[in-house]
A protein has these predicted regions:
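Alpha/beta-hydrolase superfamily serine-hydrolase fold, recognizing
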Residues: 1-226
Length: 226
């Protein structure tokens, strides 16, 4: 659903407030392209910044919202698996860390309160579909595979990770479960729940909450920049 065009305002405001250069990869999307196309593109984009644009890995923060947050996490875990360079940090906005939607926040009450994601998810439930149908083939839907379900990942020796999530969104439990994994693995992290906010509220750059959230990100990047 997301694209460089759909996220132009969000990325522009975030780049301005953080004083950074942001590259938005035009990675392959489902349902036309199923997993692992997205993971392949994420790893390729990270390596291109190093090999073609002469960045060091310590200069790179991988970020993403919703499904892009999933991609950021699995890209990190794939790079760790390869034993290659890791990014300086991760910034995750309402990350889709549990594509199966097994957490406690996946319920009709929360769907009614999440004004962005709720209507779409309710249609999925009404049709008795899986949340990941447009992303995964059934043979890839292994909930123990961290390169698909990053809530099952091991984050030991990973770089600092920042998470922002709204309290009124269906994916709230994704972030909470991910936070528990980071605590378990002693991964440096900063976690923020935004009271009353819906899924990826950052898309509305005119809200004061969005500007404040972007300033949180700027502080995080300043703290951990090399």
């Amino acid at each position: 659903m997301g694209s460089p065009k759909s996220h132009y305002s969000l990325v522009s405001y975030l780049a301005d407030i953080t004083g950074t250069t942001i590259y938005v990869p035009d990675y392959r999307l489902g349902p036309e392209n199923k997993y692992p196309a997205q993971l392949e593109d994420g790893v390729r984009a990270f390596k291109a910044l190093i090999n073609d644009f002469n960045y060091s890995s310590e200069q790179i923060t991988i970020g993403g919202d919703s499904a892009g947050g999933n991609l950021a996490l699995i890209t990190l875990l794939k790079l760790k698996e390869e034993g290659t360079y890791l990014p300086n940090s991760l910034v995750l906005l309402s990350p889709w860390a549990d594509p199966a939607g097994t957490g406690e926040s996946y319920n009709l009450e929360m769907a009614d309160r999440d004004i962005l994601l709720g209507p779409m998810i309710k249609k999925v439930w009404e049709n008795n579909d899986n949340l990941y149908d447009g992303y995964l083939n059934n043979e890839d839907a292994d909930q123990n595979n961290p390169l698909v379900f990053p809530i099952s990942g091991n984050y030991e020796n990973c770089p600092p990770i920042m998470i922002q999530v709204g309290t009124e969104e269906l994916l709230l439990s994704d972030s909470r479960t991910l936070k528990e994994a980071l605590e378990r693995d002693k991964c440096i992290h900063e976690y923020f729940e935004w009271e009353g906010m819906y899924h990826v509220f950052h898309i509305d750059v005119n809200m004061p909450e969005t500007i404040s959230a972007f300033k949180q990100i700027a502080n995080f990047l300043d703290k951990y920049s090399s």
